[in-house]
Structures are given as structure tokens and as C-alpha cells.
Curated annotation (Swiss-Prot):
InterPro entries: CSN4_HTH (IPR041406), PCI_dom (IPR000717), PSMD12-CSN4-like_N (IPR054559), PSMD12/CSN4 (IPR040134), WH-like_DNA-bd_sf (IPR036388), WH_DNA-bd_sf (IPR036390). Component of the CSN complex, composed of COPS1/GPS1, COPS2, COPS3, COPS4, COPS5, COPS6, COPS7 (COPS7A or COPS7B), COPS8 and COPS9 isoform 1. In the complex, it probably interacts directly with COPS1, COPS2, COPS3, COPS5, COPS6, COPS7 (COPS7A or COPS7B) and COPS8. Interacts with TOR1A; the interaction is direct and associates TOR1A and SNAPIN with the CSN complex. Interacts with STON2; controls STON2 neddylation levels. Interacts with ERCC6. This is COP9 signalosome complex subunit 4. Component of the COP9 signalosome complex (CSN), a complex involved in various cellular and developmental processes. The CSN complex is an essential regulator of the ubiquitin (Ubl) conjugation pathway by mediating the deneddylation of the cullin subunits of SCF-type E3 ligase complexes, leading to decrease the Ubl ligase activity of SCF-type complexes such as SCF, CSA or DDB2. Also involved in the deneddylation of non-cullin subunits such as STON2.
Amino acid sequence: MAAAVRQDLAQLMNSSGSHKDLAGKYRQILEKAIQLSGAEQLEALKAFVEAMVNENVSLVISRQLLTDFCTHLPNLPDSTAKEIYHFTLEKIQPRVISFEEQVASIRQHLASIYEKEEDWRNAAQVLVGIPLETGQKQYNVDYKLETYLKIARLYLEDDDPVQAEAYINRASLLQNESTNEQLQIHYKVCYARVLDYRRKFIEAAQRYNELSYKTIVHESERLEALKHALHCTILASAGQQRSRMLATLFKDERCQQLAAYGILEKMYLDRIIRGNQLQEFAAMLMPHQKATTADGSSILDRAVIEHNLLSASKLYNNITFEELGALLEIPAAKAEKIASQMITEGRMNGFIDQIDGIVHFETREALPTWDKQIQSLCFQVNNLLEKISQTAPEWTAQAMEAQMAQ
């Protein structure tokens, strides 16, 4: 049967007639090829592609029929469709400028097959082949934005945040031009994930936190975004930016529903966190967040050591490296190195006396500390009152009335 299809195509290519008549006849041959199965179907479809890219066939007919051809392929078995897609792309390549729209459609379908197979890298590379900026066809902003975001997401799935960042940066140039709110949300999610994978945790936390307030996002997904914001904040390097983010999250009542709230509370209140208190939280982290740093410690260990060092600076005026190491549960030399780095980067106030082996913390003003403690107390009292009103609303109402009557 494949031979019959090839023969019909050869006869039709040498015949004359109106574009409409010829297109109708080619369409009948395509339908015949689609009805076949197995190897016969594969050979017949390949013959059809070869005929369509032949220069003897009018470009008007070729484009129209290849578009029809692309609509049929998603209904075929994935293995057959994948082979046909690759064959078609190879045959079209010498005349790719003439078939840009059809090539884009083929690449989108082929990427979907690779995605179903969880072959993320090949899926991304197939989409990269669409000439969104360099081709003759003018693609609309939403199509380009959606494609760039899909490429970035696929590279993230393949654990390649560098390539993902390259394509999210291209999407950044387009997202302000799009009015599609759903795409805007996808952009923000993808950008937050890229920052997260690139270990830019505080920027990722800010993006996730912003997403957690978007009403267009489902409530469960908003809470998921808030959870990611909290995790990224805990993993971020200690400093003013992180302190501000901790304060923002601690004041957000939704965070009390999250499993990591206990760690958040300790960090916000500048309490020392012990290693055995981190096991449950460490189990919640994603694989890329469990990576080790240059000194061999995990990202979480490093973040907690820096937090504990900052907390110690608010408890002591000065401390020896030996005592600091014991407090942080690390060797004295490592404690000195981290303290030195934090002071140099302006993330902690103080200076190091290497002769005596002491780190001196600069005296902090008492008022801001008192303010923070009072603020924390008021916050906890408010939470307590809310819980009482939820448990005993009638008693609360009576107590309020009695208070007002005094």
C-alpha cells in the first residue's frame, strides 16, 4: 500500500490543475496514508513528506497540506509520530524559511512527546530550534513568552539552572508586553524557581512570597508558594535582607500552618538553633537545596551557623574562637573564618583580634532590641486572643462587653 501511495504522489506531481483541485487530491492521498498501519503507514507518510517539500509542488499547496499533516500526527502512536517528526524536520531543513509555521508546530508536538517520556533535555532542545526572534514569521508576544517559559521549565526539570536562567531572561524582556495574567503567573513561578535553583535564596523568597498573595492562584498553591518562601529564607545567608524577610513571614499568620514555623520563630527571635532541631526541616528540602558548599557543609548547615553567629553577637560583647566554635558546634578555625567573612561583607558588626583569638561584637543599641521584643510579645498575645475567641466566642464577646462597660 505504501508503494501505491508513492505512485499516486508521483502521478499527481506531474499533473496540472487548479490549486484547489490538486490540494483536494493530495488530501485524499494523505487520508489514505493515515489509514495504513505499522511500517506501511510509516513509509507512506515519509513519501508524502518528500512530495510536499519537492520544489515541483506549489508552495501554497505544500504549506496547506503540511499544516493538515501536522494535525493528524498527534493521533498516531508516539513512537511513529516521533520518527515522522524527525524525518520531516530533516527533509524541510533546506527550505525551512518557507515552512516556518509548520516547523514550529512540529517542534511543539515533538517536545510534548519527549516531555511525556520525561526526556526533559531533548524536549527543551527541540523547542530551542523554533526561530522565535530570527525567522521571517512574526510570532505574537504570548506565543514567544509561553515557549521561552516552557524551555526554562524543561531545563529546570533537567537540573540545568544555567540554561533555564538564559531563557527566563529572554522571557523577562517580553513579560511586560503580555496582558495574559496566567502567563504572568507562570513567569513569576518559573523565575522564582530559577533563583531558587541558582541558590539566590533571598531573591527567590521575595518572588515566592509575592506569588502567595496572588488571588488568581489557587489557595493551596498560594500556601505552597509561601512554604517555598519560608524554606528559601531559612537557607539564605544571614544579613539585613534576610532579617527583613524573616520579619515579613513571622507576621504572616498563614506561616503558622507550615511545618517549618518552629525554625522561623527561632530565627526571627534570634535564638540559637541546635543541629538536632534541624533533622525534620532538612527532610523537607528539595534535592538542589541539599547541596554542599565549598567547605563541605550543607547549605542548611551554613545558613544555621551564620544565624547562630548573628544571634551570638546579640548575646555577647566578645567571645573567644574556641568558645564560639563550641557554641556553633564547629571547629574554632571554621568559626573564625565565617565570622571574618560576615564582618567583611557587612552582614555582622564587629572586629577580630587574632592575637588574643577573640571576636568582638560592636555594642548594639538597647532600644531597637527592646522594640523587637515588645513587638514579638504583642504578636504572641494577639495570636493567643484569636485562639481564645475561636474556641470560646461567647465568653470572648461577654468579656469584651464587660471591658467596654468599665
